[in-house]
Amino acid sequence: SMYKTMWDIRNFEENARHFFSIGQIPGFVHLYSGEEAIATGVCANLTDKDYITSTHRGHGHCVAKGGDLKKMMAEIFGKSTGLGKGKGGSMHIADLDKGILGANGMVGGGFGLATGAAMRNKYLKTDDVAVCFFGDGAANEGNFHECLNMASIWNLPVVFVNENNLFAESTPQWYSSGSPTIAERAQAYNMPGVRVNGKDLFAVYQVAKEAVERARRGDGPTLIEAITYR
């Protein structure tokens, strides 16, 4: 159930926070606590054959897409039993069997991967879709514009999901963006742009359902802006 998925994400993150705080996890962790409704509501509409790309704050996406919790935690600990044999760590968790193309330490690094995955799906004439999760800071990277433009031109089955937690590290969105909302940027690329309360699980689920079904039908990409906080 979606409730269990949200609980699994929060429980996973609380454990990650604890072990990081006592120095047992190498490197750094960016926790998804508080944003669980977005990954859960979106991924509830996906299958194992659908692809997602994630962010440096990506544990929640991987859990919601069906990633193995024990192997994920092993990866964060740098163990050879992890999904990436302990080589990727917190910011590079991937599981191709579940369609998880990877969390990404590069801000905005998932745009090209998701667009490419969607191009693959269209070329092979499948009804699989790709979903790109990204933060508000990534919306100001050049490849945001490039990939949304390509997705529109080629009518690709991809859904861009902006998790707008209002701050890119410590920079507020109003200070870094000329447009009042990220969703309205979709107009420039002739695709639907939808704004939703990212704390409302059922609202996110419904908006994502419409976007995913649109992509599966071959009607092209959608940009979703989910307002949340971390």
Language model features: what each stretch is:
Residues K4-F20:
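N-terminal glycine-rich anion-binding loops that anchor highly charged ligand groups
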